[in-house]
Amino acid sequence: MLRFGIIFLKLIFIFFLSSCTLDEPNEFYSPTAGFLQVFITSDDADTTINILGIDYSISESDSMDLLVYQGKAYDLDSNYAILYKSINSWRQEEYTYNIIDWANMDGYNDFKIFESHLPPMEYKSLTIGIIASVLENGPYRIPISLPSDVDGVLAIPVDFIVSENSVTKITLSLKPFESMTRYQDSYVFDRMLEVKSVEYFNEDLYAQIIAESDLP
């Protein structure tokens, strides 16, 4: 009799297990991240600067060092995600770009300054550290600095969405020469920066980025 009872309990237990669903409940669903790319370029309409009463136009030999660091993306609740140089990066680093890298046939070149995994949701702004240090134009080498009371990290309002398995690309446009105001023997850099475009790409570019990064 005892043996029969044990067998009966085992059958009930097996029936219970078979009736349980193994599907993951919706409340435990974890969405796949998307990618955010941030590019920066200079405005092709801003190509001349007046130095000591003489107008100088941009040339392929000119340069302006622009230090970029500490990128963040803020969602609608003001929570932020840290931006990295590439999806293989494991820490934030500083990078310097020649923001007036000019090609006579094509205009200013652009630079990919961030490429990061981000949770899929709506975002409202970026913050990026942007500091110019020196301009080499014609025969001149001119030091550049931010205004004394201005922080190096710049807030950039921009509404955008990151979706699962997709890529969001933001391009920023800087007016390098219009941003500069002469002060004694140097120039103050006021960072006239705007959002040039926000573009969205599907899973094809997402897969390409992963393939090129050698991530699993």
Language model features with spans:
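Sec-dependent bacterial lipoprotein signal peptides
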Residues: 1-18
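A short, solvent-exposed, low-complexity linear motif enriched for acidic/polar residues
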Residues: 21-216
